[in-house]
Amino acid sequence: MYTQFMISKKNGKSRIISAPNKKLRNIQRKLAYVLSLMYKPKVCAYGFIDKKDIIGNASNHLRKKEILNIDLKDFFYQIHIGRIIGMLEKKPYCVGHEAAVTIAQLCCYNGKVPQGAPTSPIISNMI
């Protein structure tokens, strides 16, 4: 259901991409849309948020004495299926257990959120 390949990062290292096949990708796109209707981002959130970008985020930090910029290693892969199920079952989402499990299974590859799936950005923001 997934094809894995490597891409180069700016620092010269590689990143593993796990791309879903066409059928699963279409399902995930629709699911990502439904999840986006449920998710209300915090004002401070900028990653993967419509009409927000790196320029807008950076403008919040103009004239600051210090700025910390970090890149979390394997960020999506740190989110496992159990966290997704738990998040969906609790407030504010309150999704039933069976539905939460099904959604989580559709969003995960080998029990984790893959880099390359259409659902990964919204799931990471919801978590």
Predicted regions and their residues:
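Charge-biased, low-complexity intrinsically disordered regions
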Residues: 1-33, 37, 59-66, 80-85, ...
